[in-house]
């Protein structure tokens, strides 16, 4: 569990440090080949923790993709448009307190990333328990 949480933290930190990396990773299918040693290390840690090789690779891929997708969304909410407003300001103007999704301050921080990571971890635990 902590391995996957830490991996999400590292992916998020990397996306924060290098603006635009998030979308670049999604646009170039071979991007992951540049971090093969890192991937192997994470997968090996997960295998040592009890996951099968395929499960471990899937778990990291799921966490990584989720983290990157969340970062893309948060970056869009932070971005200032031609009208001088941020994405979150535009969303606030287009929603009400009765909308399905009501903007919250956390949306421009990490959004719901941590909840999603915990959801994935719980699901993986159930699969491993079988």
Residue ranges and their predicted role:
Residues 36-85, 127-129:
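Hydrophobic alpha-helical bundle segments that form small-molecule/ligand-binding pockets
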Residues 9, 16-17, 68, 122-129:
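Residues at helix-coil transition
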Residues 1-36, 63:
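Hydrophobic alpha-helical connector segments
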